[in-house]
Amino acid sequence: MFLAAALLISAYGIINATAIRVKRITVKLENLPEAWRGRTATLVSDVHLGHVRNLGSIRRLVAKVGQLKSDIVFITGDLYDGTAADYNGLAAPWSTLSVPLGQYFVLGNHEGFSDSTRYLNAVSGAGIRVLNRDKVEIDGLQLIGVRYHDATHAEHFRSVLQAIGIDRSRPSILLTHAPDHVAVSGAEGISLQLSGHTHGGQFFPFDLFVKRIYGQFAYGLSRLGTLQVYTTHGAGTWGPPMRVGTNAEIVLIRFE
């Protein structure tokens, strides 16, 4: 009986992991420029392309992103799984998207398991801009990117943000892979942090561990003072290719 139940749950988890949902949220930012009101962004994270997630997977994902017709696309790391793969081929589908304000990417922890040059070259070659301790200004909004390994220690993360030069009088969006040290993000004037990494725990009992580590920032939209944080489940899986109690997702964000 137990074995049959385990097999059924596993089968459900594998099927559920391939069904990518679209999560829709609205974020209100203080002093948002008029040009940004009503604009949308698609947030993608934790695709984990490699042996399990292949070219067919990324083509389906990119097609779903394209259907949303958002103004800008954010990819917050772990696009690749740090395994041997055709990096250029797996990045190529992104080049088929028409995104008015562009696509932006920050490195996650899995891309740091080996030389990240291959990933960065592939992503850049597909027309995606890599943000690494960098800031881009788009119609009065500051878009900031900090890679995972620059955000794991609070004081180093703080120094990185301070060096970027954030204008506290204008809204800012931080792309960084994990919802670590969100108090630092808030203290340095970030308006909205977008992250992934947690997978929502992916399945029991890891969901409990993730909630214990990250608390309210483990998944969804949360607030810490003036800082808002959205942590996504991500679009892929790590380890067993299954999800039970969580959904694979991409996020359509509307700004107001």
List the predicted regions and their residue ranges.
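Alpha-helical transmembrane signal-anchor/signal-peptide segments
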Residues: 18-31
